[in-house]
């Protein structure tokens, strides 16, 4: 994209004004892209080196996929019947609408008031077990939906996902009873009538379909690209180890570092999270102890024509013939499970585990990754062969063609770029290049928009694939500005600033930041006397690039960071979130990290008015008033629906699945398993085979179609 910066006058037309100021997220991305540049068909998921092979970790990939699919859909994984799929059963996302509200617990600046109470801008009285209505959306209300200055009501509440009740872990049952042994503690927030309800997460659940292409996962990117075999945090977690067999009776703890394994990093977070899937204090080794001797999916129907599991289906139709231990032995190298040694994972705890139990997090994460790598939706109308005469696939309506032009004219594809319609994908994917890039560009410096005070412009550092979109005030959820459990910044930019200040010798994550390859290198706006040579980018900044391989000296960095707005070292990190894919977006509501919009129409209104608030760091956002007509809005929604893969809509292979009973709010009465818990009500998800849903079942539909007025 051709980018230029200039002073502008306040009288300029808003839409033209936005176009003048917009620059590409990455310099290789252009504003008016050809449709063919975003077709996904033919793209392969980035390979995880040294993972699959006869002497590698995974020795039977198909068995690993089978194991991963079973684990993903098995309600036994959770302490109280929650599966991974409980939050991802509908086009990879969650369309439940009862007991899904979180009071805004990520709003740490207001932790003792609104972050503990439920306030919907609709005026409806909400709380635990509340059933969301269509009229509760959107969560930011405007007298004029086209005017950002007419806000009338808002909330820090979030539509999350219902998970587990508040309980302390005691023990698992290796056979028999599915639920773990746990002791209830009265929740300060999630209770009704003196009984604990299931908690709801403080962010909306994104789709897992096409997540295999993402360089990092989770809204805040904390699921590291490098999988360490135990936790989501990659090489940051220096205590993470796996166990190798050294003969029959001995094991050795060794580190693991698998690149392009963010899905595995993501997969190991929810099962031990006390809100999502676990009683507090349960470990992955405990989950292994619970599952290994059980038949996979022992209580759930498996369809006779399941595209992955049919060959392992038990004759009864319920579950598989194999136990999880047997599936692991088929899928993984025996050096990770064959030892008879017992391992005390926590010193002096007196609690010992088998090698297979101790490595269960690794088996779980990698198997889930192998399964989710198959969930690629590359057969939407958008992906069909292009008619040379029209420039569009056959079947595109005039409305959809106009919508694609609106999508480009409004610069939606500055963020929703590449074949996945997300710059959070691995750079090789979103740059749509067959040639392997010389390095992975994950940090940039650019002018993205106006300065809050007047119309000056500045350059800001930002993590590619994450954006500030003005969905809610920064204090409601800081997103990418958060830290890991070890106190380290999640953001690559914040890590880089630590390097520039001299507080760190190198990046915490194995990421190269190349100032010579930034849209706005430091040589653009720093004096030569303020700069020093950058030693860390030598491998990239060669030849002509050496002249721009300069960074500000530590004392200059300190002076800039002391300025209001951080001067020439401003960043786009606070309240930045991972840019989601737009594929199948018709089916994956509610939308945004807070789930505050029920429909694509509300999303388009949001972007048209320039967000929900005027962001104080407007130089780091691409969300501006667009001035769309009603026809433009309708056309844009029509185009977005061309990104729906009919296999996803009808749950045809590879999107078929076993039966699942999903917790969906509570009904009157006490839970028969625990006198302090409210009685669950359930949503039954039928098993579906490779041919997909029947005509009687009908297709999956949008989130708002399930809501009462």
Residue ranges of model-derived segments:
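N-terminal signal peptide c-region/cleavage motif recognized by signal peptidases
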Residues: 25-26
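Periplasmic c-type cytochrome electron-transfer domains
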Residues: 5, 13, 30-709
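Cleavable N-terminal signal peptides
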Residues: 18-19, 29
């Amino acid at each position: 994209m051709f980018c230029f910066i200039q002073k502008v006058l306040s009288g300029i037309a808003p839409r033209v004004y936005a176009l003048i100021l917009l620059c590409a997220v990455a310099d290789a991305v252009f504003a008016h892209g050809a449709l063919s540049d975003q077709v996904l068909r033919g793209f392969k998921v980035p390979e995880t080196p040294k993972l699959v092979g006869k002497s590698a970790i995974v020795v039977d990939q198909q068995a690993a996929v089978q194991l991963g699919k079973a684990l993903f859909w098995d309600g036994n994984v959770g302490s109280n019947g929650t599966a991974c799929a409980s939050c991802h059963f509908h086009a990879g996302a969650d369309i439940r609408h009862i007991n899904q509200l979180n009071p805004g617990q990520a709003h740490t600046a207001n932790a003792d008031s609104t972050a503990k109470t439920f306030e919907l801008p609709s005026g409806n009285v909400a709380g635990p077990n509340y059933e969301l209505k269509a009229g509760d959306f959107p969560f930011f209300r405007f007298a004029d939906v086209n005017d950002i200055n007419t806000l009338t009501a808002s909330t820090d509440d979030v539509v999350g996902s219902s998970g587990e009740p508040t309980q302390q872990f005691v023990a698992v049952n290796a056979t028999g009873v599915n639920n773990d042994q746990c002791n209830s503690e009265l929740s300060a927030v999630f209770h009704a009538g003196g009984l604990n309800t299931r908690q709801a997460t403080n962010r909306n659940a994104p789709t897992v379909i096409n997540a295999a292409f993402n360089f990092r996962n989770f809204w805040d990117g904390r699921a590291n690209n490098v999988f360490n075999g135990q936790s989501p945090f990659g090489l940051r977690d220096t205590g993470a180890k796996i166990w190798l067999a050294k003969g029959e009776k001995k094991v050795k703890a060794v580190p693991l570092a698998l690149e392009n394994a963010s899905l595995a990093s993501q997969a190991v977070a929810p099962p031990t999270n006390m809100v999502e899937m676990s009683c507090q204090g349960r470990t992955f080794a405990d989950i292994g102890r619970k599952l290994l001797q059980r038949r996979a999916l022992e209580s759930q129907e498996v369809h006779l024509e399941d595209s992955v599991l049919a060959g392992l289906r038990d004759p009864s139709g319920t579950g598989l013939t194999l136990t999880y231990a047997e599936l692991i032995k088929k899928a993984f190298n025996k050096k990770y499970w064959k030892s008879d040694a017992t391992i005390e994972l926590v010193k002096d705890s007196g609690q010992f585990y088998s090698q297979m139990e101790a490595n269960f997090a690794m088996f779980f994460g990698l198997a889930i990754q192998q399964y989710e790598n198959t969930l690629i939706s590359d057969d939407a109308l958008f992906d069909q062969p292009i008619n040379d005469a029209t420039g569009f696939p056959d079947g595109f309506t005039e409305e959809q063609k106009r919508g694609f032009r609106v999508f480009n004219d409004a610069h939606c594809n500055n963020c929703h770029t590449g074949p996945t319609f997300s710059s959070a994908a691995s750079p090789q994917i979103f740059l749509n290049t067959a040639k392997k890039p010389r390095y992975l560009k994950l940090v940039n410096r650019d002018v993205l928009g106006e300065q809050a005070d007047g119309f000056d412009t500045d350059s800001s550092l930002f993590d590619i694939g994450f954006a500030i979109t003005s969905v809610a005030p920064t204090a409601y959820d800081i997103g990418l500005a958060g830290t890991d459990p070890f106190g380290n910044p999640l953001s690559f930019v914040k890590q880089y600033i630590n390097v520039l200040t001299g507080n760190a010798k190198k990046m915490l994550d194995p990421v190269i930041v190349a100032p010579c390859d930034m849209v706005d290198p430091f040589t653009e706006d720093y004096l030569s006397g303020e700069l020093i040579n950058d030693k860390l980018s030598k491998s990239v900044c060669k030849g002509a690039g050496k002249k721009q391989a300069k960074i500000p000296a530590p004392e200059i960095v300190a002076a800039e960071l002391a300025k209001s707005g951080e001067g020439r070292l401003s960043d786009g990190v606070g309240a930045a979130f991972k840019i989601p894919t737009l594929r199948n977006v018709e089916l994956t509501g509610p939308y945004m990290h807070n789930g505050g919009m029920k429909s694509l129409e509300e999303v388009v209104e949001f972007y048209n008015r320039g967000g929900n608030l005027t962001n104080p760091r407007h130089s780091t956002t691409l969300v501006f008033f667009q001035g769309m007509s009603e026809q433009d809005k309708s056309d844009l929604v029509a185009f977005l629906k061309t990104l729906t893969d009919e296999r996803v809509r009808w749950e045809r292979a590879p999107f078929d699945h076993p039966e699942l009973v999903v917790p969906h709010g509570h009904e009157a009465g006490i839970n028969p398993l625990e006198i302090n818990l409210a009685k669950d009500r359930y949503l039954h998800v039928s098993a579906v085979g490779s041919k997909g849903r029947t005509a009687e079942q009908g297709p999956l539909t949008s989130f708002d179609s399930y809501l009462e007025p």
